[in-house]
């Protein structure tokens, strides 16, 4: 929240996307006020990605209940925030929004069921490809587009991936991911870091970005 607020204040053109806020760990009323502040500071350039997270230690660190890591709960909390922003069912809490209906919401959904639920409260996908695999990205886009067709909406398609450039690219990725994925255990983190992300040259990165664009991505 602090970093996004600072970026909102220091910039004037770029879109600010949070990918992702694990909203199931937090109070939705307080979150609504915090995100409204970023929306105001950025003059409407803020987009909010939400999800349930995958690290139990993150929940434990703030006293949140890991059993609440559910998409149904996430949907409820997003709707509470949207009610506050719209001021339809709750008294105005402030701060005032710059965007008329609040920030655009993207869902950090991975599985098919999560994507189906995301249709009810989001404007699209804040996806992630663990192995920087174009087919994985295409499949996720197709599932989201199919899910949104049922509500006659055109989803925003955003994805992301880890990458490293240069001669030490794979080694750099391994160093980062062994630390980042350490909660999985050293052996599993080490194994996953051998294939995760894209390790290559600037040309490799540009070519992959073009593939993602051709797959229908609106942003990476």
What are these model-predicted stretches?
Residues 1-220:
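Active-site-adjacent structural elements that line small-molecule/cofactor binding pockets in enzymes
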